[in-house]
Amino acid sequence: MKRFYLSLLLLALCTAGFPCTNFIVGKKASTDGSVMCTYNADDYGMFIGLCHYPAAIHPKGSMRDIVDWDSHKYIGKIPEAEQTYNVIGNINEYQVTIGETTYGGREEMVNPKGGIDYGSLIYIGLQRSKTAREAIKVMTTLAETYGYCSEGETFTLCDPNEAWIMEMQGTGKDGGVVWCAIRIPDDAISGHANQSRIGVVSSYNTEVIHSKNMIKYARKMGWFTGKDKDFNWKMTYAKPDFGGRRYCDARVWSFFNHHKDMSRYLDWALGVDKKATDMPLWIVPDKKLSLQDLQKDMRDHYEGTPLAIDSTNIGGGIWQMPYRPTPLSFKVDGKEYFNERPTSTQQTGFTYVSQMRSWLPREIGGVLWFGNDDGNMIAYVPIYCGNTVQPECFNTPGADAVTFSDRNAYWVCNWVSNMVYPRYSQMFPSLKQVRDSLENSYISQQPAVEQKANSLYEKNKAEALNYLNNYSNQQAQQMLARWKQLATYLIVKYNDMTVKPEENGHFKRTPEGIGARVQRPGYPHSFAQKYIKETGSQYEVPKE
């Protein structure tokens, strides 16, 4: 039974396509003093809305079920805390935000009999913590007490004042756990994307917290024999290979490269040169990042770099789609090849950019900008951290991974994006116009909304929280309505690989009232050249 469980676990990792991306911005690295972090939760078939755990006082002796976040399988029970806090999505009422990416690590370190998984650690951590530091304590204590059953994991833990990265792995059959947490400097940005990121632990000029057995366990297993000061977490527990660098670290490299010249580390991201200079855990950006900068970073396809997939090569199809089918690697005539794996990817189940601000009342300061599909294909909707009722579109009765609903954001957004993907260069501008219009309206409204909420908060806290909750839900439902309109617009505008002309925001009609003659754009020139190069004279029209 144990062997079967481990086989399933490793199979899940191999087929997940290197899921998930997190970016982190310290408060002195942001334009307004916010701590910010992001999360793309990526996995094929993943259907997850906006979760909610209400604040509660629990009777003494209460127990809570532990259910594996990925498989929904029951693991066991643990004692419940006396008090738990309100959680909406991946942020709680104290603005604590926790995200993750899975990196796997050494297979023999997995403990399938462990009593708690990474997803449960995240949401219990959110329910029991007022700060990122407290979340580290809660999560590591739980893993040490009950055993950790997941693979190697990198966690992002942020609050309005601090940003941390923590990595954790089990210790196999003995049921223990090793972990290390690094505070990201306030003026820095960091990230992780399914490859362990913590290097030589003693080299970080910042706060470091780790398990007592972090080095001792590695020595016991014969994986590390050097001096303590030279202990390198990832080279010991999860050494980067080609995939770890090209599919994973390259996403972080590209994020960094948007904000500082990272050409020195390009060879590391390319993954071929084994002697390439390793990429730092964090960098200080040339300019401070705004919320909009970070949203743009979540939409990255390596544009403008040697890894770019928005080019005119044949992999993007006729209309230059900056997406590629999976699996990431494939074989042709006995040779193995691969596709790039950018941050923006079609298998995103949900995405967020979390904004945490220390100068505002906590329920106003924390905003989870949330969407239910690829970050490039959605408008990030503001969800305030004190909200207690989810928008229906993010929590739709009856909708799931195999049940479509036009009341559900995941399905409506995927409906649109899956129309756009194969005809990207034609159709994406229409989506982008709607997306940017919505996001710009949310951002322009934010100061006035929060000013009103602040005034209400001073007189009646409950009224202020209700106002923000209603505002979030209204914007989410507005987004859904606009996306439905976009879906019907796209099918009319681009029906049958033609383009219907417009005038003054309406489809043109003839004087007699029927639809105007459609345009037939044919192949883009770059694709036509490749097509003829491949087919030669097969389709050449003979001269009369």
Predicted regions and their residues:
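Sec-dependent signal peptide recognition
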Residues: 2-8
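A contiguous strand-loop segment
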Residues: 20-118, 138-289
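Short, well-ordered beta-strand elements within core beta-sheets of diverse protein domains
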Residues: 122-128
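Glycine-rich, aromatic-lined ligand/substrate-binding cores of catalytic
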Residues: 219-368
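Substrate-recognition/cap regions that form aromatic- and gly/pro-loop-enriched pockets
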Residues: 318-455
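Histidine-centered catalytic/metal-binding microenvironments
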Residues: 435-544
